[in-house]
């Protein structure tokens, strides 16, 4: 078998570095390249600037097989380049508005697609839909799926999620109730939720993540909600006040970036998925002891390994569509710093 050449664009960032570490440990035969805007110390460091298409030539020169995108690419230059050059592509960074644009662009080029194009920017590397499928394989039975997220400001945080919140906190986004899109805003519509892993009852507020789009528009689940709480009850209630009093509206973007951009030295992250059918409610709870970056990176590595196996034909996928959900569940469950609980 030929050695696979993998390029991680944004490989010097928080999640990119962890992807490279886990990939190298699990697959020493992969040939790993790091793409960033600065030149690096070795010939494995490629200058790749998503805003400068000329720099993309190095992707062809180095015979890259698969591109992992972990940086913002507003104009979808890398996606278009991958389609044109028949390269495998996985993107883990797109927030909902950008994801829908990229997905439409890929579908418009469907006839030209000869490689595997995978969108994996759902929560924590796109594993929620796999867990939903694992809990209830018959999607037609599911009436409602709710995701509850425990987000620690002490965790190591990448810039992309903080910048997304800073830029979009004042804009409405869509949740789905009985297949009717409803416009809501971040940090409103609070409810109480009892988290597992010793966290207990917390106020949770609206959050826009791509799983809203994926679970309703792709998986056809009629009602989908996502809500989050911060580890600090004070910070959580403060965000609620700021939104309800429209304080975010009068803040400069830089100020909002500072507010959302706080990052610590690492902390756990937790999310829980509630799946409701006509006659029962199921719940799966996941804790990543090492936080968001580790979980997102490990999920991404699972997708990369699947893409490079010879079992996946060319086409457009969301990451949960490339695996059996049992494979994903078992891989997560056996990873040393991830804990899973199931209540049926």
Name each model-derived stretch.
Residues 6-24:
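N-terminal Rossmann NAD(P)H-binding glycine-rich loop of SDR-like oxidoreductase domains
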Residues 94-115:
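Rossmann-fold NAD(P)-binding glycine/threonine-rich loop
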Residues 49-64, 74:
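Conserved Rossmann-fold cofactor-binding substructure of NAD(P)-dependent oxidoreductases
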Residues 82, 86-100:
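ADP-ribose/adenylate-binding Rossmann-like module
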Residues 237-344:
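C-terminal active-site/capping subdomain that shapes the small-molecule cofactor and substrate pocket
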Residues 35-39, 50:
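N-terminal Rossmann-fold cofactor-binding loop
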Residues 65-70, 90-91:
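N-terminal Rossmann-like NAD(P) cofactor-binding module of classical short-chain dehydrogenase/reductase
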Residues 9, 138-265, 271-284:
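Active-site-lining helix/loop region of Rossmann-like oxidoreductase modules
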